[in-house]
Amino acid sequence: MQPVANKPGHSSRVLRLTAKAFVLLSGLSIMSAGLWAQPPASASWPPPRHFDYNYAHEARRAAEFDLDHLDAGTLHDIFAERRRRVLQAIPGGAMLIFSVERAQPRRLEFQVPNSENHDFMYLTGLEGLDSYDSALLLLPSAEKNWIVLYTSGDPAEMKQATGIEEVKPLAKLEEDLSVALTDYRDWRITQIRRWPLPAALAKAWGRDHKVLYVNYPRFLRLGMPEPPRLEFFERMRRFSSELEMRDSADILDPVRMLHDAYDLACIRRAVQITGEGIVEGLRAAKPGRTETQIMEIMDFVYRYRGATLGFPTEVQETPLPPAPPAKEIPEGFIDFVPRSQAVFIRPGGVVHVDTGASFRDHSADIQRHVPVDGQFTDEQRRLYEIALNVQKTVISRIKPGVYWWELHNLAVQMLRDAGGYDKYYTYGIGHFIGMEVHDEGDYEQPLQPGMAMAIEQGVMPPGGTRIAFEDDVIVTDTGHDWISQNIPMELSDVEHMAREKSRFESFAGKEPLSLAPEGP
């Protein structure tokens, strides 16, 4: 079988991701030196608009958006508006988005069940069994914008579930596309009447250059089996030499980067639930408990409140046990401890959590801490205040027109001025959030209203106490909305929380468990 990377229309995606990987690796070296490369001189503010939509209004409206009383008609309108924006952004040709029924690691990070299906879910609202073996065809044309859902389910039920008027059995997809690839000039009037959709697609495509945007895999794990849709795409390309396949991510990523009020309301709810889980988990972080117990408390709260995990919850007590002198533990890899392994919390440390609930497939991403003895030591307090000051200052600068690199360089400079801690700050200032915890977005563009972002930085001296904050922020037309600010982070609030009892005390006994024996 021909490698995926060599397929026409797919090689550009591979090259683009390869370039991203090069930029990421280069960025680590740049960031360790304290600088993030500035965007090209051609970048300007405000950026060009690809569709007419008031994202500033949506960002303002999200705070009052009622997620608990949404009727089917309102949800249909939300997804119809998304499809309209995508149709408006298609520069020519058509778009075909298949549902995806397999999970893959998110860019070599972690397992998220719906990751590769999020584009289909974003446009239809369908997930799980409702989305099984389905495809969505979007065709902008002067006469009519075609939106057709092909489904393996009952067409009448799917029409009611999505509000999409044109719903066909999945078996009709291959027939429609086969007919549409015929030169439109060969069509007779009776054929046009018989196949209105293929006729419209054939006319829109023309004769010499037929563009079809398709959802290639976002993950490119070449060692894994190819998804079936790639073989279908390849058969279509062989059927017509004029057909050019392009990656739908080129259109969908900019649309998904700017959120509507429903998106932002879901992110807000995810942050709220995450805060509840963090408070309960960190209240229980006492000497003798295990990191796994803290993880499970937070995860239980998320699920009890109607959410799932945006990514695997990470709990870690610092300082870490000393490593052999020759061993370097890369930041970002030290947190993943198997839940079957009992890592006991010891007196005198600080428990750090990196966690996020996902509500209706929109993820939060928060980092917080608690002193396990109920009070920070003088050194812990000093490091905590440094990181907290940096976090507040960086977030205060968020507004439309600001670049990611400006926020990153500000954090690096402040960490450097505080005592050279920029040397150990080995990742960027943050990332977009949305349906993915590390969502799609363009980091060279200035910030715009409707973006949702996680801001993270911290003080991580080798062998010392790790203090790292992460907060979720929405960009508004007037500045920003710091939606995770109510999750305890002020020193006095955190110490007070550390001395409180968790509502889960009864599961672990009235008193903290005794410490595990010292290991070899």
Annotate each PLM feature:
Residues 7, 35-520:
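Active-site neighborhoods and metal-handling regions in enzymes and metal-associated proteins
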Residues 18-34:
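Bacterial N-terminal signal peptides
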